[in-house]
Amino acid sequence: MFVIVDLETTGGIYNKEKIIEIGLIKYDGSKVIDTFEKLINPFVKIDPFIEKLTGIKNNELNSSKGFNSYSADIYNFLKNSTIVGHDVKYDYRVLKNELKKNNFILENEFLCTLELMRECYPGLTSYKLKTLSKIFDIKLVKHHRAMDDAKATLELLKLCNE
């Protein structure tokens, strides 16, 4: 079982990042089983650069629940799966830190579609998610929104598993 993960975060100081949006897709290797998508209040004001990049506004986050309200659901969604992401090490680290603060230990294996695409399709000029989506005609409506990026990442996983 795979769970494709994409996070949007506050950015900033290493290990101080907060999740502002999460998109999860549970995939059994042939079909999507379930999805999970939430805006998450980081309880800090997000930088105008992040607002512009993601389109997520501070006022939207202020009316959302904090990560602790979703931590058990997120942990259970991820349980017994391989976590998949594009440049996954960042998302995995941030997610692991947030779950740890809520007494959940994330020890899942993970798979990086950026590295996978480099192996499956060597010699491309760029392996950024947006570029790969254009090259392989993958629908990416709102880049830097968690669920849209997760959906595009799933399509990259499928390309390498064909």
Residue positions per predicted region:
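Conserved beta-strand -> loop -> alpha-helix junction used to position metal-binding or nucleic-acid-contacting
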Residues: 105-117
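Short Asp/Glu-rich motifs
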Residues: 70, 118, 152-153
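Acidic, divalent-metal-coordinating active-site segment for phosphoryl/phosphodiester hydrolysis
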Residues: 145-158
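Mixed-charge, glycine-rich, non-catalytic linkers/tails in nucleic-acid processing enzymes
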Residues: 160-162
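Conserved non-catalytic scaffold segment of RNase H-like nuclease domains
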Residues: 1-108, 122-144
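Short beta-strands and strand-loop turn motifs
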Residues: 5, 111-113, 157
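Active-site phosphate/pyrophosphate-handling residues
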Residues: 93, 115, 151
